[in-house]
Amino acid sequence: MNHPIEKPVLIDKEVVSELRFPEPDVLFNPAARTKRQTEIDRAVYLGNTEHTKVRILFHDNAGLKQIETTIWGATDKRIILKSGMVIPIHRIQEVKI
């Protein structure tokens, strides 16, 4: 991991729209970024075929957050959650299925 051990704050997906996301990517290693994209692609597939919820660990400007929700889609820059909220991919640390 690229961050010191930090306990994530569990939040509701409805508050994602209120969060602020800095520009730098939270992952510096190219292999970690590839793994993150693979996790996102799998989560989108499972979200659309089986409505599977996943745990998303991400960083906003205040620290590490966690939500459990369905990822309905992804662009090259953002994931789209079940509720229509979006999270920038460059701020996602991990997607756990």
Where are the language model's segments positioned?
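Short, Lys/Arg-rich amphipathic alpha-helical interaction segments
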Residues: 72-97
